[in-house]
Amino acid sequence: LPIAEVGAILKNHSAIFHTDAVQAYGSEVILPHELGIDLLSISAHKINGPKGVGFLFKSDAIQLPPLLHGGEQEEKRRAGTENLAGIIGMGTAVSLLTSTEKQARKTAYQSFQTIILKALEEANIDFSINGEPTNRLAHVLNLHLKGIPSDLLLMHLDLRGIAISTGSACTAGTVDPSHV
């Protein structure tokens, strides 16, 4: 379901709605209050910011218990020293990501998808798009290439300077399919 529909369904329930917006934040306009989102996670490295830092949007209606005890940071939810350089780097990356930049990225990614799909068709490669064929993020193209081992494809494309993944970061290093 689209995020707005999920938010509308959950609006009259006691469920807390969290969405992982790491992939979408760099190319989509996300308005948590309009979408009914209570919690939203973002990672800086997806928008050209530093690795290892992100942010959590929290609706004012949500109360979160502390993760670590012993300090006053983060409204008494997380004791410890924050990664100030990472936070500043992420803030800079966010400030540079205007709606015009998001649209430019989205347009470029859609062009890349069109080029890739056309090249596969012209090469008579048997493939299918996993998931929704039209309503998907412009920068995510999830394909099944029939009869081509993923490790072989990964190696050959890497040697040609093309970066792909054959699974999620959660399953890196394993050949087993994701449980999700």
Predicted regions and their residues:
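Pyridoxal 5′-phosphate
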Residues: L1-V180
